[in-house]
Amino acid sequence: PCGLPTDETIPIGRYGSSNVGRAKSVYRMGLGHRYGRRMQTISGIHYNWSLPGVDSEQYFALIRNFRRHAFVLLYLFGASPALCPCFVEGREHRLERMEGGSALYLPHATSLRMGRLGYQSEAQATLAVSYNGLEGYAASLHDALTRPWPAYEAVGIRNPGGDYNQLATTLLQIENEFYGTIRPKRVIYPGERPLHALRERGVEYIEVRLMDLNPFEPIGIGASTLRFLDVFLLHCLLSDSPPDTPAEIHELAHNQHLTAARGREPGLNLMRQGQSVPLMQWGAELLEQLGPIAALLDQAHGGNEHALAVALAQAHLQN
């Protein structure tokens, strides 16, 4: 975000006087206590995506592959390498001051929003959510929704005046507080919890959450990027997707933070199945695999716009 006032003067979202509206406001009050209100000024693109005939098992396979390859999206489309000093006031950081200005940045950063300065917390860092299936995923979230967290217990549900501080003192107040790069989703009924909807009726679509706003696009994202995402997500769905492991989950978090903070650093290596591999090499291999899918989409829709989107990504990777 741009210049901000002091944290306590940033207003909390208000959603009316209904029970649902009040719960939304209390949830955001809780986010303010947990992460600071400045965090709620962060914006990004959420891209919802589905295909007919795809079941929960297939969506989770897609999600596992997406998480493995998300570094490519951060590298290509990350657009938050710098920020206003007010955003990190009172927080530890290793940002540098931009020459001739007041902005702070990291020289090779791609997306500070998706790094350690974004929606991250000591509490959520303890979560190692597996995406091997709906039940395991749901069990992980249920644990976070019911596990008390000492720092949040200290805040309490209500303040001395009786007003709500937060919805709960557990690690997560509600499911939406878990900030992953991608989520399995289901349209919910009025009053229904997202986790209940997923367990009862399965995954209906996925929500991609790591895309930064493109400052050069009026609506924050361009048509070419959307076409690339469609090709990328189809590749994630169609490719072999072995189960994840605790070791791989740790690797993926490492890769995300490294790419967010240092993704454009020449010679940067990521971790893949316990081995160090150059980001550029891995990224080039992945983009090469997208070509046939782009060609099939263009064959179905006419033109060559999907192939051009992949070619543009390949050019950006090498630039």
Where are these regions (language model features)?
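C-terminal, active-site-flanking charged/polar segments
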Residues: 210-216, 223-243
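Exposed beta-sheet edge/beta-hairpin loop segments within beta-rich domains
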Residues: 34-43, 199
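Histidine-centered divalent-metal-coordination microenvironment in nucleic-acid enzymes
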Residues: 39-52, 205-212
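Core structural elements
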Residues: 200-204
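Signature for HUH/AEP ssDNA processing cores
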Residues: 1-23
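Loop-rich catalytic cores of soluble enzymes, especially ATP-dependent carboxylate-amine ligases
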Residues: 4-5, 22-33, 50-198, 209, ...
